[in-house]
Amino acid sequence: MFFSEVINDAYDPREYPALSLLADCWISRRPFDGLKILVATPIFRNTLVQYQALLAGGADLSVGYSNGSGGTSVPCDRKIVRLIQENGISVVTDENVRNGSVADDFDLILDCAGQFSFCHPKKGFVELTRSG
């Protein structure tokens, strides 16, 4: 699976039991086949587990972050951003969508701190709080 080496070097599946179980189930069921999903949460090594589960489920995944242009800035680890891009996953900023260089054609957006609240997903938003 995507990112297995990086994840396994840092975490034991017992540390993320729900996402581990979901990835195992979703790899055969593929509930997200054909869905374009934007995940806009802080980008760090631990969020690779979330991406891995969504990819196992067939998601056409994009990872997004705001660099503050829309009033919100969410942190990210540039090393992990590069790793994601090296694995062929689209990384977009809110500014990319605002200026039209990336289409606002997502089916589902998982959004932390409202970074992409101006978008119009076909299926809807999942609001993930910044407070934890």
Q: PLM ranges: what are they?
A:
Residues M1-G132:
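N-terminal ligand-binding/catalytic initiation module
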